[in-house]
């Protein structure tokens, strides 16, 4: 089952295709993927065809099995979407 952000929690697409949260940064406090840890942001990525959450400091496994590393809040490289995997 996919992890989905609350309706209306993200707004205004950034140039990278991600969805921004509140003005001035990404939203905090959501849970990520299969890991019960706090998210750095609750944003959506259209590159893989479904919303994903991104963790602040640890990799997580997305719905399609890719590992995605959240490096910096608001500056995410969707490595899984490009065939890269972090461990």
From Swiss-Prot:
Pfam families: LINC-PINT. GO terms for biological process: negative regulation of transcription by RNA polymerase II. The keyword Transcription applies. Expressed in brain, liver, kidney and stomach with lower levels in breast, intestine, thyroid and pancreas. Keywords: Nucleus, Transcription, Transcription regulation. GO terms for cellular component: nucleus. It is found in: Nucleus. Interacts with PAF1 complex member PAF1. Interacts with transcription factor FOXM1. Enhances the binding of the PAF1 complex to target gene promoters and plays a role in negative regulation of transcription. May function as an anchor to keep the PAF1 complex on target gene promoters, sequentially pausing RNA polymerase II-induced mRNA elongation. Inhibits FOXM1-mediated transcription of PHB2. Encoded by the circular form of the long non-coding RNA LINC-PINT. This is Transcriptional regulator PINT87aa.
């Amino acid at each position: 089952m996919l992890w989905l952000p609350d309706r209306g929690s993200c707004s205004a697409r950034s140039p990278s295709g991600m969805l921004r949260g509140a003005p001035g940064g990404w939203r905090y406090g959501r849970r990520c993927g299969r890991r019960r840890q706090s998210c750095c942001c609750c944003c959506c990525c259209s590159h893989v065809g479904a919303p994903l959450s991104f963790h602040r400091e640890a990799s997580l496994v997305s719905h399609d099995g890719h590992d995605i590393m959240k490096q910096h809040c608001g500056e995410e490289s969707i490595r899984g979407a490009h065939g890269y995997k972090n461990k």
